[in-house]
Amino acid sequence: MKEGVGSTQNRDRIAMAVTALVLFGAQWFIGDFPLWFFAAPMNLLLGVLWLVALWEGYRHRERLSAVRYLLSAEATYVALAVATVVAVVLGLQSEPASTSWPVVGGLLFVQSVLTLVILRGWRNERGVRWRFLVTHIGLWLAVTSALFGAPDKEILRVQVGENPTREAISEQGEKRFLDYELRLEKFDIKRSESGSPQQFCASVAVDKRVVTIEVNSPYSPRYGEEIYLVNYAAEGCVLQIVREPWRGVTATGVVMMLLGAVVLFLQGFSSEKR
């Protein structure tokens, strides 16, 4: 029996290694993962189907060695390592890395392990484990928004001049029309004592509201959308609009993780007092 278990575990490890090689090979030979294809509603549909598949896999885990492996301590350690590496990579180069096959595959693995862990541990003989749920669901929301929310992130560029415009260009070169008008009021270049440019500042009318946009100091017309100053030319300035509709999900996950950490600290403090 032990040999059978060991053989199954080795087979699962080999499958993981082969999957990792396939992901890196896809990145090398195919290029970036086509996130645009999985934009809403495709990502929502696939996300629901994947959760249903994980739930069914958990229900029949006694017959599925792959699910049992994902529920093992080894898979948890691997998921923690993968999550750490992905976080570092995304922190260093968010835009190019988020579309790579290894990062997408790594996030899917972490999300799968986390989902199964939540299904197994959300309650015990004493009832619902609320602290466990708050912390783990918070992490689950953060990982899920990074995985399934990435296709919905949109980056647009707008050439803004004296005449109002609603037309923007996507990263794929497609036209997009904004639900607000943009018009350049004025552009200032603040220089240092030596005469070199020190700060770039654009006054832009967003519909009827005039706002100031500086380099690395964007304006947010609504939650999850920011307008950045990118460049300036004789015909006007170039603005970049970044839309992240899943930002609220990410923020909720982070708040839940912090809340879980606070509850853990308070419980530990009260235990020490007793």
Where do the model's predicted regions map?
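Solvent-exposed, non-transmembrane regions of integral membrane proteins
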Residues: M1-R274
